[in-house]
Amino acid sequence: MSEPIRVLVTGAAGQIAYSLLYSIGNGSVFGKDQPIILVLLDITPMMGVLDGVLMELQDCALPLLKDVIATDKEEIAFKDLDVAILVGSMPRRDGMERKDLLKANVKIFKCQGAALDKYAKKSVKVIVVGNPANTNCLTASKSAPSIPKENFSCLTRLDHNRAKAQIALKLGVTSDDVKNVIIWGNHSSTQYPDVNHAKVKLQAKEVGVYEAVKDDSWLKGEFITTVQQRGAAVIKARKLSSAMSAAKAICDHVRDIWFGTPEGEFVSMGIISDGNSYGVPDDLLYSFPVTIKDKTWKIVEGLPINDFSREKMDLTAKELAEEKETAFEFLSSA
């Protein structure tokens, strides 16, 4: 057995965490021979609920869980971390402007970035889930100058998985048969789900998605809006936001960081845009296609971008630049 790793989940009393913690504890994310010390952080009013989650994790009797720590204190939560999964954020309330939401979250992620900087290992991998995820991730990274910015990523894997699933449903295959879809940009309704480079396995051979679907207007229209608005559709139907699918996407994202991506496949995650070859301005936290090896991501370079894609990629970059500007105004005054 290897040494235990310390894994933090914030917002640990919430519903995404409730769907996520069992998978982390049972070895589905870090492997079946990796012991874990699981740290659960939430705000003080949630400590009663968190106690219940702690009891349930104990009652799961998971052999890999060496210890579970529930706390509302950052100095305990962020100490010596190997992995931080930042799920907790201020949710958008009725009548709340996006700007107000940004302001509330800048405060949270500035504090958590500073706590990572002060207490966590410098090699910590930080995954931001709480929305607005891209800008929250950038805020945390800026507030943790001693941790390499490449160690920060935000979740767009849920969008990626949604795009895969839509193509699979359209063609009557399993999601597993679809690979190399891309989510460009922001985890918001301006994101651009791109299948120009995606492949699908049909009758044992790989075919381009455009060739397989044979319906360009669907791929350039309804497919894109369905993926962009899927989160809202789930809320409308379930009266709660996506939790099971979000937790599954977090597992996929973190497992790929830990073990790497399969040969010939790439995945989507929000990462720092510095030095990309796709004309996205530097210093944005933007979702790109990446391959991962030795816990290090690399942007997939050299994919041809048509005019349709260019316009959509620029639009979501513009939104991210505006979010960043608003967030940084708050950051300097926070």
Curated annotation (Swiss-Prot):
| Residues modified as N6-succinyllysine | 110, 214, 298, 318
Catalytic activity, EC: 1.1.1.37, 1.1.1.96
Q: Which GO terms describe its cellular component?
A: cytosol
> Mind listing the UniProt keywords for this protein, alphabetically?
Acetylation, Cytoplasm, Methylation, NAD, Oxidoreductase, Phosphoprotein, Tricarboxylic acid cycle, Ubl conjugation
Q: How is it modified after translation?
A: ISGylated.
Q: Which positions are tagged coiled coil?
A: none
Q: List residues modified as Phosphoserine.
A: 217, 241, 309, 332-333
* Statement: the UniProt record of this protein carries the keyword Translocase: no
For this protein, the record's CDD domains field holds: MDH_cytoplasmic_cytosolic
The family line of this record is:
Belongs to the LDH/MDH superfamily. MDH type 2 family.
Which named protein is this? Malate dehydrogenase, cytoplasmic
- Its source organism is Sus scrofa
Higher taxonomy:
Eukaryota, Metazoa, Chordata, Craniata, Vertebrata
Q: Which gene encodes it?
A: MDH1
